[in-house]
Structure formats: structure tokens, C-alpha cells
Amino acid sequence: VKITQNGLDSGDVSRGSPDHAVTTETSVAEQIEVFRGPATLLYGSGAIGGVVNVVDNRIAKDFVGGVRGFYGLGGDTASNRREMTAGVTADHEQSVWHFDAFTRHSGDYDAPTFINEEGESVSSVENSFIDAQGANVGVSYLFESGYLGVSYGRMEQQYGIPGHSHHDHDHDHDHDHAHDHAHEATHAEGPYADLWQNRVQVHGGWNNPSAAFKQVELRYGFTDYQHQEIEHGVAGTTFGNRQHELRLTATHEAWQGWTGALGYHFFDQEQTAAGAEAYTPDSTTRKHAAFWLLEKEHQQLNWQLGARVEDVQVNERSFTPVSASFGVTYSMNDAWLLSA
């Protein structure tokens, strides 16, 4: 499954290991989209499990009608989680400004009593704490036939890595300690990840540029990411990711009943890993791709066709993947769909 934010890659290293976090934050999102079948070829050729796209309003396409805001508080007793989110979007002359932020803290979460690796009876998953915070700011300029905007976001997160803790029995501690102190003990006794990410995105759109096209959209993203896996106060392994991504998409008018979009996708990524568990070699990846998605509705059937051609270079090796996909959905009624 590929995770994107506003149609651009999440920019983390979560696909490399199950204990690497996804950096796309859903608590301040406007909506979450799920794509399967031919539509996934707009985003890449390897998303066989689908694409999850998190959409926010940091770069607004329309005026919000004055000032609009949100706030939220959340928590639970299983991990003593405490979460707060807030955001505001405001019109100012021909521009729209946006700011949002979140903070989240939780200790080790409760679980049915089980015997751990040391043979002890415990009722919580050791080293499962999370401390995270982030903020984002964006501005867009709206004109008669489109928009242009930029956003910047920063995320910082520390989270425990369960399953890697080993007790020093000369320094046993009480397993019934309060949840709000769980992450403090875990920092000292078990490995955890210390993560940060900076993200810049630029979006632009041009409506009705010609008789053949409804809209042309440009999206660019730059991401700088790092996380360190820390044990006994020492950074054992450091992972880094810097990437540039550009997507140009043109949505065309109906042709023989078929609507759709075609475009160009550029991706440049430099991934690094150093330390005791750096099992993935450093790599530099560059991709150029062209894609086309077609869709047609006929009575209760929705037909989709997708194609993508890529020129991929990983270090000194080159590849030319070619992908095609076909899908159909049958609408049985308002509640049921059959897809193939």
C-alpha cells in the first residue's frame, strides 16, 4: 500500500520495516481517499495493495467564506493517550491562509495478561509509547482561472519499538507504574525511534485552459526526513530520506464517452542508512513517468483503463517498467458494489 499526502509521496521510510512510522498525519486531514485498480497507476507502478491519499486544506483551492477553524481533544485509558489538534483557515483579499498543529502523548498500552520473553506476567505492551507533535502553515493565491500556493510542515516524534526490550535483572522495576510515566522508563530501558521531518509542497491549478482540457494541475513536494533508533542513550542506526517530486496532471473533456486524466511524474530520492542495523544499502533513485487514466459510465457499470510507462534509474542500474490495468464496477444498488 502506498501512502500519499495531497497526491505526493509521504517521504518517510515506512515501507522498509514494520517498525518505521508513517509520517502522514490524519488527525488534521480534511478527507482520506482510497484508490484501487487502474487509478493507482497515477501514483506509481508498485502499489498493488492500493493507494491511501490523505488530503488537507493547507493550500486552499477556494475561498472559505471568512474564517473557519477546528479544534479537537482526544484520549483513552488503554494507553493514557492525550491528544489535541487545532487549525484555522482565513480569507484575506485574494489569498487564503492556513495554520494547523497537533500534539499526542501516550504510554505503554494495556493488553490481556501474558508471559513476556523474560517469563514475567505482564499486562501492558512494553515500549509502545508515542510522543508526537507537528505544525503546518500554508498560503494560496486565488485568481479567476485557478490558484497557486505553498505550504510548510514540521513533524517530530519519539516512539518505542516493542519486542526489542531486555531487562537488567539487577535493576528490576515495578511493572505497575503509572501510565503517564511509562514512556520515561521506556526511554531509559528500551530502544526507541527519534524522528523528524520537514515537508514543503507547492500546488497550482489552471481551470479550462483549452477546449480539450478541463483543468491542468501542478504539484511539487520536497521532503527531508531522518530517524534514529536509540538504545541505552546511543543512536545505533540512522535512516535518512531526501526527495523531490513533481506531478503534472491534465484532466481532459469527454471523448467518445470516456473521461480521464493524463500526465507526467518526476521523482528523485536519496535514501541513506548508517549504523548497526543498516541492512538497506544507500540508494539514489530517479524516475520519469507518463500515465493515462480513462473512465466511462454506462448504466450500472463503471469502466476504468489505466496505463503507465516509467524510466527508472537506481544508482547505476536502469529499468523501463510498463504497466496497464483494467477494472469494472457494477452498482447493484445504493449500498452494494461489485468490483473486478
Which residues does each predicted region cover?
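Membrane-embedded beta-strand positions of outer-membrane beta-barrel proteins
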Residues: G69-L73, F99-A101, V139, V150, ...
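Residues on the lipid-exposed face of transmembrane beta-strands in outer-membrane beta-barrel proteins
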Residues: A86-H92, V137-Y141, V202-W206, L246-H252, ...
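Transmembrane beta-strands of outer-membrane beta-barrel pores
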Residues: L73-S79, H92-Q94, T103-G107, F143-S145, ...
